[in-house]
């Protein structure tokens, strides 16, 4: 189990992915609230996402940022890209993440781009398979990131050195 990352100790940048107005129907009519989906990252291998709900948009965003700081994950990278191809799943959302050559940039749509850019991955290609709901795409991307392993981790799991592994 990886250690918990303290988001309060990092210099984080935040990006609002989506804001949604939701309604609760009561006897006197509708009561509106706002939900916010926010991604935070230090562009140096740490990224997290959070959701918040409140009567006003700024409060929802503040709550989402606090939640995101509690849900940080580490992103292993090789130079400016990810170590290997991976598919992340969540609900109906599925995201294919592939390493890309240097200078390619982040080839990804909306929510996935926000997660990858704030994670500090400069070159990656992605494809959304299935649901394109922002929350499902963000969660599927985070799931894919959690599956990533660098050469040192794989060598340790197999009981070999990195040189033996890479040939």
Swiss-Prot record:
One of its GO terms (molecular function) is structural constituent of ribosome. Residues 12-75 form the S5 DRBM domain. Transmembrane segments: none annotated. SUPFAM superfamilies: dsRNA-binding domain-like, Ribosomal protein S5 domain 2-like. Disulfide bonds: none annotated. Keywords: Ribonucleoprotein, Ribosomal protein, RNA-binding, rRNA-binding. NCBIfam families: rpsE_bact. With S4 and S12 plays an important role in translational accuracy. Located at the back of the 30S subunit body where it stabilizes the conformation of the head with respect to the body. Belongs to the universal ribosomal protein uS5 family. This is Small ribosomal subunit protein uS5.
